[in-house]
Amino acid sequence: MKKVLMAFIICLSLILSVLAAPPSGAKAESVHNPVVLVHGISGASYNFFAIKNYLISQGWQSNKLYAIDFYDKTGNNLNNGPQLASYVDRVLKETGAKKVDIVAHSMGGANTLYYIKYLGGGNKIQNVVTLGGANGLVSSTALPGTDPNQKILYTSIYSLNDQIVINSLSRLQGARNIQLYGIGHIGLLSNSQVNGYIKEGLNGGGLNTN
């Protein structure tokens, strides 16, 4: 009788364990912040097609990747800063997230820093990655933000072969600065090596020693 009871208990335990296990095709809930992709002068949201596809292949959810289209294509901070602020607020509301991460190309880097420095973005962003960013037009240092518990982490990626934005504008004091070679300004948007550094930056691999 004891053997029969023990066998029954073992069988019941196995059944319950199978029922409790998630389906083999189920994916774990994304732990990433929503990502806002910020284009530069004369750019558009489609500039980030390759980067979006790469991030999706690395586990980011497609519905958490947002690419802004600025009305003002000249990169004017006074116009693009407020639009970016409103856009981030909408993303936070839609996703329920507390913060976003930003990947910005060219003048989009300056627009992002302007938003952080002057328009309340300092407590709404966790990680910033700039690609050939014209960062120095707003700040030459990695702005810490306004969250007392967590500085904004920065990764600034730029190329010695960039003929549009000089490297000295892209470098941010206190950030993780990565100088590459053989990649043009537009090429930063579709380069596999750059993609790897973007992933690291979005996963908290940036720096802020300020």
UniProtKB/Swiss-Prot annotation:
pH-related activity info reads:
Optimum pH is 11-12.
EC id: 3.1.1.3
List UniProt keywords, sorted A-Z: Hydrolase, Lipid degradation, Lipid metabolism, Secreted, Signal
Q: Which GO terms describe its molecular function?
A: lipase activity; triacylglycerol lipase activity
Q: What is the effect of changing residue 106 to C?
A: Complete loss of enzymatic activity
Q: Where is the secretion signal located?
A: 1-28
This protein's major location comes to secreted
Q: Which GO terms describe its biological process?
A: lipid catabolic process
Reaction(s) catalysed by this chain, per the record, are: a triacylglycerol + H2O = a diacylglycerol + a fatty acid + H(+)
Q: Listed GO cellular component terms?
A: extracellular region
The annotated dependence of activity on temperature is: Optimum temperature is 37 degrees Celsius. Stable up to 45 degrees Celsius.
Alphabetical list of Gene3D superfamilies matching this protein: alpha/beta hydrolase
Q: Which cysteines are joined by disulfide bonds?
A: none
Transferase is among the record's keywords: no
The entry's active site is: 106 (nucleophile), 162 (charge relay system), 185 (charge relay system)
Induction (UniProt)? Induced in rich but not minimal media with glucose as carbon source (at protein level). Induced by growth on n-hexadecane and tributyrin.
Its annotated compartments are: Secreted
Q: Which domain of life is it from?
A: Bacteria
Summarize the protein's role: An esterase which preferentially hydrolyzes triacylglyceride substrates with short chain fatty acids (C3-C10) with the maximum activity towards tricaprylin (C8:0); essentially inactive on C18:1 or C18:4 substrates. Active against p-nitrophenylesters with fatty acid chain lengths from C6 to C18.
Family designation: Belongs to the AB hydrolase superfamily.
Q: What is this protein called?
A: Extracellular esterase EstB
Originating organism? Bacillus subtilis (strain 168)
Q: What is the lineage of its organism?
A: Bacteria, Bacillati, Bacillota, Bacilli, Bacillales
